[in-house]
């Protein structure tokens, strides 16, 4: 008998032994525009942000004006370091990965600034080269989007990093002095001049043609602000920036509106608003140079890349979505092991399915993830469980999942609690008709399983669910026959109707999967 998807994943995980410890980790990012502290918990492969604070110190402005980090910008940075040291100690972070990028790298008094900053922080600060920054940024994208294939572009205040990623590797990389603050200084605020500088610099990147007609992964706070603005302008229903995807032509058109100041930016935070026209122009010219098929936003960047770089290859290969769901199940479900039984129980559910937005492997992966967290709303009022579980899935800091995947899981897990989708609170978020049917059928099968087993392990292995072309068959062993009742008959029938096939209930010997 061939191994199921779940069996293969469990086998791969067992061979790795214990994951790296999940003591709180901290990263301090000293950028050209802001200084940010992020504290993480969870496993090293799926770091969960537990604290995130930034201060807009604008060190790059000081460097552009005088060549040094001095004055009010320096004083604010040092005040921030004192506070962040106290916060890191409060969080229990023993090792703080502190690094600095373009502004500190380019400052005439870089060594002096770093020495004083290290005294205030109590930790060493690593000044990254431009090339290291590009590699770490690409690593951060791959931590959250393992299948990334294309160009990673990270726009900061002092520089623009580009890296080609493919097959979970960084192939080529370069750092260019095309950060927003640097460009505004070099071009004296003239967007036409700034555009010429960007075009000239990109023309020298010989390997850029290798990523033509691939995905462009955009990184950096100003580009994220631009993407958020685009989501608002188009009425996009899911307010999650990570893995937000946009048609390249549509984004290029929108960038033109921003760079020519033909659209309202009032909803953008004031500390980002002035930089948006320049950032939009850089993105527009970059898209002209590489002709991407799509734009994907990554919430992960250099900070996460620093953590990812410390992982051994065997841990990098672990699925970040499934690991995150396992950790969530341990925190929020009645039984963490029940989800694995449920994943095996539903293994034959999609044997004849033909998803439209997902490959068969991706559908199985989403099914596994859904099984792991299908009980996370158990302690909420029954009237609100469908809404709670849907909103949790839609907004959880998951990585390694597309927006279509989030919506699929949210709809499926809502049906696990409530047949009437009006009560799901999904605000019209839908998939294609075929994939929506799959989500409904999956959710109603989970509803059947939880009724059969009381959401606890030990029962499902004595039953079998099998979906054929014409019948959905539930077999219950004779030892567990007492578990049958009207609610099981009803929920089996409803699940079968969702698949468009007949419900069959049997008792006795279990067939092989």
Where are these regions (language model features)?
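Short coil-to-beta-strand
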Residues: 47-57, 171-176, 315
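Non-catalytic pre-domain segments flanking phosphatase-related domains
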Residues: 1-24
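Dinucleotide-binding Rossmann-like beta1-alpha1 core, especially the glycine-rich loop
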Residues: 98
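N-terminal basic/disordered segments at the start of proteins
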Residues: 19-48
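A short amphipathic beta-strand at an alpha->beta junction
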Residues: 293, 499-513
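A short acidic Gly-Thr/Ser loop motif
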Residues: 28-34, 153-159, 219-222, 299-301
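C-terminal structured domains
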Residues: 491-494, 498-501
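Helical "lid/coupling" subdomains associated with nucleotide-phosphate turnover
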Residues: 3-5, 25, 39-42, 62-93, ...
């Amino acid at each position: 008998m061939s191994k199921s998807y779940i069996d293969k994943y469990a086998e791969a995980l067992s061979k790795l032994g214990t994951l790296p410890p999940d003591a709180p980790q901290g990263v301090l990012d000293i950028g050209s525009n802001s200084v940010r502290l992020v504290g993480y918990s969870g496993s090293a492969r799926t770091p969960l942000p537990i604290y995130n604070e930034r201060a807009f110190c604008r060190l790059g402005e000081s460097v552009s004006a005088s060549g040094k980090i001095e004055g009010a910008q320096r004083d604010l940075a040092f005040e921030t370091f004192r506070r962040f040291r106290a916060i890191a100690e409060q969080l229990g972070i023993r090792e703080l990965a502190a690094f600095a990028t373009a502004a500190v790298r380019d400052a005439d008094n870089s060594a002096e600034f770093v020495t004083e900053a290290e005294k205030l922080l109590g930790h060493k600060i690593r000044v990254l080269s431009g090339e290291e920054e590009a590699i770490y940024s690409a690593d951060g994208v791959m931590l959250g989007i393992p299948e990334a294939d294309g160009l990673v572009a990270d726009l900061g205040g002092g520089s623009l990093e580009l890296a080609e990623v493919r097959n979970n590797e960084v192939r080529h990389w370069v750092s260019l002095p095309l950060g927003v603050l640097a460009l505004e200084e070099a071009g004296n605020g003239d967007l036409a001049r700034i555009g010429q500088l960007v075009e000239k610099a990109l023309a020298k990147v010989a390997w850029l043609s290798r990523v033509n007609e691939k995905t462009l992964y955009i990184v950096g706070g100003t580009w994220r602000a631009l993407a958020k603005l685009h989501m608002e302008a188009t009425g996009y229903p899911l307010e999650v920036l990570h893995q937000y995807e946009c048609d390249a032509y549509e984004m290029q058109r929108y960038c033109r509106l921003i760079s020519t100041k033909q659209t309202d930016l009032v909803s953008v935070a004031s500390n980002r608003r002035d930089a948006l026209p320049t950032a939009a122009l850089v993105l527009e010219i970059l898209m002209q140079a590489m002709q991407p098929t799509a734009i994907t936003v990554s919430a992960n960047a250099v900070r996460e890349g620093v953590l990812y770089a410390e992982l051994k290859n065997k841990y990098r290969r672990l699925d970040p979505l499934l690991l995150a769901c396992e950790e969530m199940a341990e925190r929020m479900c009645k039984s963490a092991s029940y989800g694995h039984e449920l994943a095996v129980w539903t293994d034959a559910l999609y044997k004849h399915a033909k998803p439209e937005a997902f490959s068969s492997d991706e559908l199985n992966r989403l099914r596994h993830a859904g099984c792991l967290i299908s009980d996370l709303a158990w302690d909420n009022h029954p009237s609100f469980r469908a809404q709670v579980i849907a909103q949790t899935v839609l907004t959880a800091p998951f990585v390694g999942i597309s927006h279509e995947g989030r919506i699929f899981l949210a709809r499926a897990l809502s049906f696990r609690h409530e047949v009437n989708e009006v009560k799901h609170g999904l605000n019209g978020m839908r998939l294609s008709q075929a994939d929506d049917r799959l989500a409904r059928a999956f959710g109603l099968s989970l509803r059947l399983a939880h009724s059969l087993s009381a959401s606890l392990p030990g029962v499902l292995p004595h039953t079998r669910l099998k979906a054929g072309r014409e019948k959905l068959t539930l077999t219950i062993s004779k030892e567990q026959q007492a578990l049958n009742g009207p609610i099981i008959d009803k929920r089996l029938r409803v699940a079968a109707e969702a698949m468009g096939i007949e419900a069959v209930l049997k008792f006795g010997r279990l067939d092989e999967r």
